[in-house]
Amino acid sequence: NVSSEAAIVYNASKKEVVFEKNAHIKKLTASICKVVTALTALENLNKSNYLIISDEMVNVEGSRIYLEVGDIISIETLIYGLLLRSGNDAAKALALAYNNNEADFVYKMNELVKKYNLKNTIFNNPSGLDEDTKNYSTCYDLAILTSVALKNETFSKIFKTKKYSCTLPN
């Protein structure tokens, strides 16, 4: 008996749905969209590169990793902050690290979704914060995207991490 409105159990190795309840109903993604943000960053940015944090990157709502203007931080460390702390500032920084343009990064997120022929998912921003129902997906699409992400060695390593700390070079 599942009390949630929508749910899925997906066997990624067999590419098989074991259980589903309303798995194709569109819902707001909220922070689960950060799985796609992380995968998009890993596919389009060099995780070893460093980024200087700008004012635009720190002015975000919601959960944060508390970046400060002038911080110098690696792409990989930002992905840790994105996935472990659900850092909206990390999401914004990663998006702006791609062509210095959040819209270009979000376009890449949506291209990633299309690559797997998932027609019920669309992103409008990299954080999942959404007041206008523009970031949506389904349990099914998110199960597929998460199984794809877990095949990425760096994503899988970060996703399994229980505790992470870093020292910034500045």
PLM features: what roles do these ranges have?
Residues 1-153:
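Active-site-adjacent loops and short helices of periplasmic peptidoglycan-processing enzymes
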Residues 146-170:
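Extracytoplasmic
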